[in-house]
Amino acid sequence: MAKNIQAIRGMNDYLPGETAIWQRIEGTLKQVLGSYGYSEIRLPIVEQTPLFKRAIGEVTDVVEKEMYTFEDRNGDSLTLRPEGTAGCVRAGIEHGLLYNQEQRLWYIGPMFRHERPQKGRYRQFNQLGVEVFGLQGPDIDAELIMLTARWWRELGISQHVALELNSIGSLEARANYRDALVAFLELHKDKLDEDCQRRMYSNPLRVLDSKNQDVQALLNDAPALGDYLDEESRDHFAGLCKLLEAAGIAYTVNQRLVRGLDYYNRTVFEWVTTSLGSQGTVCAGGRYDGLVEQLGGRAAPAVGFAMGLERLVLLVQAVNPEFKAESVVDIYLVASGADTQSAAMKFAERVRDALPGVKLMTNHGGGNFKKQFARADKWGASVALVLGESEVAAGEVVVKDLRSGEQTTVTQDGVAAHLRTLLG
């Protein structure tokens, strides 16, 4: 017997019982995005490898350790996208969307990183990203955070997420801070773990978010990033904080929040939760005003964020069990009799035409009434329509409310109005 082929470790199948809650959550996210006037952009899963090296930074963990990179038959180096911002910027430049224009975009789809699989973190994961181009004030930063706060309210998880903010300043200010931080770390090199020693020169700001508690204790005496901010970045951050306070959005300033990708400047933020065990990031982003020019376009301010959907789904299921998936089926059509199946299928099409938002499933494969009603229950239907030979001949249908057990016979022409009342 041939050996079964299984999914690659860290790349998961999502079965019908799981995808229903995903669809409801994604529908909620998309509805809110539409209410703010944001438009969808669809991007390739595979990009040229240099795009990510230039955008993310060659000495980041993503590029050094986590990318799925391969050569195609032409000898070109290609990479499965590890994140969406670089591809979105590339598309904006390529199609002339960014120069002297304002764009508010979102995308959704799979990303790929070769990480150690664990709860809420996988090698293929689904991400929703939002990117805004052409606006440089703190007001658009605030709008993005307000948009995410609306998501949490709609999903019923507001009490289980907390906002952390920081400003990492201009590129010049960050370079000055980098020098001061490296000088401090050199004095205490013997107290750094191997990973932090490696990052000390290649990407020293990443030492700030080390998970090593001894390193975190050492950093209490390190230079503070906030002391090195340029005046323009200070004003921008103060403006953002003022807008969030006016909107009633609570936040904590975390001066060790730097984000893991090289393209960020000024505002960085994360929504975090402790409701999935240890603290985890639900959604994160910030400004990247230099990235468009860095990738070959004309300079354009930009800000955005991304959210891993696996972790969001886990969080919603953990803290808001009342947020359930909608039933797969509203109405189940039961047919009985040798010549009723054709009539039942034709009648089902009439009902779908009259009630386009209703989910109606027709019984197939025969079976007596008991078996067909059991199938209706399995699919979660709240109403059954019953067509037997006598109903077909009379132009009628039996409508049974599966919640109350009550049933009535109505004309086939009048069934749509009856169902509207019954289904609410």
Curated annotation (Swiss-Prot):
Catalytic activity: tRNA(His) + L-histidine + ATP = L-histidyl-tRNA(His) + AMP + diphosphate + H(+)
Tagged with keyword Ligase: yes
GO MF annotation: an example: ATP binding
InterPro entries in alphabetical order: aa-tRNA-synth_II, aa-tRNA-synth_II/BPL/LPL, Anticodon-bd, Anticodon-bd_dom_sf, His-tRNA-ligase, HisRS-like_core, HisRS/HisZ, HisRS_anticodon
Main location: cytoplasm
Pfam families: HGTP_anticodon, tRNA-synt_His
Transmembrane segments: none
Compartment list: Cytoplasm
One Gene Ontology cellular component annotation held by this UniProt entry: cytoplasm
GO process terms (BP): histidyl-tRNA aminoacylation
Enzyme Commission number(s) of this protein: 6.1.1.21
Enzyme kind, highest EC tier: ligase
Keywords attached to this entry: Aminoacyl-tRNA synthetase, ATP-binding, Cytoplasm, Ligase, Nucleotide-binding, Protein biosynthesis
Self-association and partners: Homodimer.
Family of the protein in this entry: Belongs to the class-II aminoacyl-tRNA synthetase family.
Protein name as it appears in the record: Histidine--tRNA ligase
Naturally occurring in which organism (per UniProt): Enterobacter sp. (strain 638)
